[in-house]
Design a protein with these regions (language model features):
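Conserved short alpha-helical elements in the N-terminal third of ANL/AMP-binding
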Residues: 1-2
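Active-site glycine/GP-rich loop and adjacent strand/helix microenvironment
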Residues: 5-246
């Protein structure tokens, strides 16, 4: 069976989540990567052995931390609603993500719309093949990546996408994830852009968490923050009231 926590909902907070994990003994997690890492850091690994992370980008530091806790590998993939979700997926070589070339044509362009050769970084452009309801023709995704040149170590010649990130002049949330989730004491954080400056609220679990977070933020010249230590049983999860069992 499975326990569906709709929209991440557990009414009683992390203490209730921990009770459900102990009672149900799930071996697989399906959901957002940062939510998984927060859960693992607050509740521990428990019975979970593997994970399918989706719905959000998975930064390298988050992926590394999850892999270390679960002692397994994650398989990065790329997609979006506009292109029909599935666009590229990692292979056993873990050297980039193979594009689904039977589904979409992939290009990398510069700021003027010129197509760049393999190996050059630029904006990812997608043309879908066979989509009738919403075909995309040279759709500018707003994502920054490159096509890795040469054949993959797995032997396939299918095009590979490198690490994908958002094109954001103020710095993307993914970059903040890379920066902050490397701190083992961090459970979660939120960031606001006010007058072009970042304001960060961070939740951590140990006495030296605030000092480590403060040091990282100061290195990046982020001067506005609020750090708060939390106990796992007191940490509230996403608002809502429904837990559906199937």
């Amino acid at each position: 069976g499975s326990v569906l926590m709709h929209d991440g909902v557990v009414e009683g907070g992390t203490g209730e989540l921990n009770r459900i994990l102990e009672e149900e003994q799930p071996d697989t997690y399906v959901g957002m990567p940062t939510a998984l890492l927060s859960m693992l850091r607050m509740c521990g690994k428990g019975s979970i052995k593997r994970a399918l992370v989706s719905g959000d980008a998975c930064p390298k530091t988050v992926m590394k931390a999850i892999e270390e806790i679960l002692q397994t590998r994650l398989w990065p993939h790329y997609g979006s609603r506009e292109m029909g979700l599935g666009g590229a997926i990692c292979c056993t070589a873990h050297e980039g993500m193979h594009m689904r070339e039977n589904h979409c044509i992939t290009e990398i362009i510069d700021e003027n719309g010129n197509v760049l050769p393999d190996g050059k970084w630029g904006e990812l452009v997608i043309t879908t093949i066979g989509m009738e309801a919403q075909p995309l023709i040279r759709y500018r995704t707003g994502d920054w990546s490159r096509i890795i040149p040469g054949r993959c170590l797995c032997g396939s010649e299918i095009k590979r996408l490198d690490f994908v990130k958002r094109m954001d002049p103020l710095g993307s949330i993914r970059e903040m994830d890379e920066l902050l989730f490397e701190i083992p004491e961090l459970v979660d954080y939120c960031v606001k852009i006010v007058d072009g400056k970042k304001e960060i609220t961070a939740l951590f679990t140990s006495d030296n968490g605030e000092e480590r977070i403060r040091s990282v933020l100061e290195e990046k010249d982020i001067r506005s923050w609020n750090c708060r230590k939390v106990k796992w049983e007191d940490l509230a999860l996403y608002p809502g009231k429904r837990v559906t069992r199937q």
